Regions:
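Short, surface-exposed loop and linker segments with low hydrophobicity and enrichment for Pro/Ser/Thr
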Residues: 6-7, 56-65, 125-128, 147-148, ...
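Deployable pore-forming modules of oligomeric membrane-permeabilizing proteins
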Residues: 210-259, 323-354
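Residues that cap or anchor secondary-structure elements
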Residues: 25-213
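Secretory targeting and sorting signals
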Residues: 1-25
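Short, surface-exposed linear segments at secondary-structure transitions and domain or protein termini
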Residues: 87-92, 173-180, 285-289, 342-347, ...
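Membrane-insertion modules used to breach or fuse lipid bilayers
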Residues: 248-299
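Membrane pore-forming effector domains from diverse proteins
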Residues: 284-340
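Short, hydrophobic/proline-enriched secondary-structure or compact coil segments at domain edges
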Residues: 66-71, 261, 308-309
Length: 355
């Protein structure tokens, strides 16, 4: 038996270079226009633009010094601090879900939320005097770091070392659609895109570049679910009695009240509440009752114990990782890990007695 547990989403930026190879093989001169034509609807909330899609909420501040933030139900917030020249940027809305921050150094920064909920941040170099490096700070939750990948991209890790996003290999295009050499440099949570215009045979301005991160999702499936009803939980003892010495035989009596809580094993990052909802065991259920029992006649020194009873559920957890790229409404899922056999205990009123 296989059951869907809970989709837990970690959100981030996404790059065109990792998802639309056509731009690298046969790039279009109007790549920026194509991107802006596919932005998600956004509305002004205070001074910020807020775009919402099926699973992502993106906040695009009017102030370039304030980070762009992305969040999803059940996922960590991801913040992206944009490049800035330290001055006051002229900001305007472009497209339905994008803003342009025109800096005073010949460059513009354009964060755009795509229709499928991914975020692209374009850096535009207006002429040869514009800067050729653009630094972003990418944080997952209250911390995180970047780890370089062999393909030229990077992984964005949260403080616990779990991937919150993946940075796709960088791309840069000039006004005629020619690729311009570019690469990333990583320092902690700082991602710097270097556009090597000097290495290009010919460059027609403006040049558009886009660092990016593909969205990382997490899903947990509960599989191999098996139930044992009226199971005696010998790990939860409720009472004990012993036939006293001094006579050949005798009886003993147990009398006690008890409280027994449900128990759920969890691993791989899955929540106990999510597992419980899937297998039908409440995470914080408490059963109260009492034990009142007298043994049959037994030899002196005999002892009896009372244990909790209920339903034993055994299962395994599968952890799936999903990544959504441009042009994809739904992520592609990959199985990352399968747990050992785990168990949950759902108590009921009553007890079992044994020696």
């Amino acid at each position: 038996m296989k059951r869907l547990l809970t989709g837990v989403v970690a959100v981030a930026l996404i790059a065109i270079g990792g998802v639309t190879p056509a731009f690298a093989e046969a790039p279009e001169p109007d790549a920026l226009e194509q991107i802006l034509d596919d932005t998600a609807p956004a509305r002004l909330e205070g001074d910020d633009m807020v775009a919402r899609t099926d699973d992502v909420t993106a906040v695009l501040p009017a102030d370039v010094e304030q980070p762009v933030t992305l969040s999803t139900p059940g996922g960590q917030e991801v913040s992206v601090t944009l490049p800035s020249d330290g001055g006051t940027a002229a900001t305007k809305r472009v497209g339905d879900g994008a803003v342009e921050h025109e800096l005073g150094d010949g460059s513009s920064i354009i964060p755009a939320v795509r229709s499928n909920g991914v975020l692209q941040v374009m850096s535009v170099m207006s002429d040869a005097a514009a800067p050729t490096t653009f630094t972003y700070e990418v944080a997952a939750g209250d911390g995180g770091s970047l780890v370089a990948q062999p393909d030229g991209g990077a992984s964005v890790l949260d403080r616990d070392g779990q991937e919150a996003a993946t940075v796709a290999p960088p791309w840069a295009l000039d006004a005629d659609g020619r690729s311009v050499p570019t690469h990333y440099e990583i320092d902690g949570d700082r991602l710097t895109q270097v556009i090597d215009t000097a290495a290009a045979a010919k460059v027609t301005y403006p040049v558009v570049a886009d660092p990016g991160v593909s969205v990382t999702y997490y899903r947990y499936d509960v599989i191999d679910v098996r139930r044992t009803m009226n199971w005696t939980n010998r790990g939860v003892q409720l009472a004990i009695c012993k036939v006293h010495n001094g006579a050949a035989r005798g009886t003993c009596t147990m009398s006690a009240s008890y409280e027994v809580e449900s128990a759920i094993d969890a691993t791989l990052g899955a929540s106990k509440s999510g597992i419980g909802a899937t297998i039908g065991v409440h995470e914080s259920r408490t059963v109260k009752g009492s034990v009142s029992w007298t043994s049959p006649s037994a030899p002196a020194g005999s002892s009896y114990k009372a244990w909790a009873v209920g339903t034993l559920v055994t299962y395994k957890i599968q952890k799936w990782v999903g990544r959504k790229t441009l042009g994809m409404r739904y992520p592609v899922w990959t199985l990352e890990a399968t747990s050992r056999t785990l168990s949950a205990f759902d108590p009921r009123v009553g007890f079992a007695v044994g020696q």
